[in-house]
UniProtKB/Swiss-Prot annotation:
UniProt KW keywords: Ribonucleoprotein, Ribosomal protein, RNA-binding, rRNA-binding
GO cellular component terms listed in the entry, alphabetical order: cytosolic large ribosomal subunit
Gene behind the chain: rplR
Name assigned to this protein: Large ribosomal subunit protein uL18
One GO molecular-function entry: 5S rRNA binding
Phylogenetic classification of the source organism: Bacteria, Bacillati, Cyanobacteriota, Cyanophyceae, Synechococcales
UniProt similarity note: Belongs to the universal ribosomal protein uL18 family.
Biological process per Gene Ontology, one example term: translation
Amino acid sequence: MTKLSRKLQTQKRHRRLRRFLIGDATRPRLSVFRSNNHIYAQVIDDSAQTTICSASTVDKELREKSEKLPSDCNSSSIVGKLLAKRAIKKGVKQVIFDRGGNIYHGRVKALADAAREAGLEF
């Protein structure tokens, strides 16, 4: 049996997880996408098929603070705090965390911890 690449393993985990993670109006889904250089997070209402709010390391608000945010845990925690602030402003307090097939470690964990500290419950 051949070994799958890390990207294919992540995609396979994501498909398996998405069967059970469904966000609605009361508890939307906090979806995380991690690339080599950036991290993106969205709060999604799957029943209405709308994105309630989003944040990433390429946001204007974050780029104004510094020219280039490094792809590390510090920038991920900044994104998590910003996303939580935007979600609470829209009236969302509880979410379902969708790690996107990524292992709950490093940048994904930093984003989740920062969102929890800023007031989101999951």
